[in-house]
Amino acid sequence: MPSFDVVSEVNKVEVRNALDQANKEVSTRYDFKGSDARIEFNDKEVTLFADTEFQLDQVNDILVNKLSKRSVDVRSLDYGKLEKVSGNKVKKVLKIKEGLDSDLAKKIVKLLKDSKMKVQASIQGEAVRVSGAKRDVLQEAIALLKAEIASDLENGAPLQFNNFRD
């Protein structure tokens, strides 16, 4: 029985490359000369540092631009609050969202059931397994999910479809 998994993952290597490029651009730009603007990264979050809120917004724009060029979906970033750190400096923590949260997984299952397609969807941890009788039906399900969930810019999520098996 053919099946595939719906997941929401971020390619950490591409994120690291985009952050390196953004840091290089921030360090060489004239308007950041003498400032402490930088970007730090650990596995689950990205931290932006700058002297002023305006500079922080510019660093964020550079980061978003570099992530987009490396084809990392910026909807996977969860923006935290602006925090003041020592002196007049500011920072912002961006959490990297990975995996489907339970609300989105339930929404995907409900959407597939309401569509009257001949597929079964089951939640398996942070992924949704979709199985059906024919490959064509599964491809229609992928098209439906791309149209309804992945294209929703406001509260959509970056979806990937992997483990497609016959």
Swiss-Prot record:
Q: Which residues form a coiled coil?
A: none
- Cross-referenced Pfam families, in alphabetical order? DUF520
Q: Name one GO cellular component term.
A: cytosol
The record's section on InterPro entries has: DUF520, UPF0234-like_C, UPF0234_N, YajQ-like_sf
Q: Which GO terms describe its molecular function?
A: nucleotide binding
* Keywords from the UniProt entry: Nucleotide-binding
**CDD domains for this protein:** YajQ_like
- Read off the Gene3D superfamilies from this record: 3.30.70.860, YajQ-like, domain 2
Keyword presence, Transmembrane helix: no
SUPFAM superfamilies cross-referenced by the UniProt entry? YajQ-like
Keyword presence, Glycoprotein? no
- Family note: Belongs to the YajQ family.
Stored NCBIfam families: PRK05412.1
Give the protein's biological function. Nucleotide-binding protein.
The name this protein goes by in its record: Nucleotide-binding protein CV_2047
The protein's organism comes out as: Chromobacterium violaceum (strain ATCC 12472 / DSM 30191 / JCM 1249 / CCUG 213 / NBRC 12614 / NCIMB 9131 / NCTC 9757 / MK)
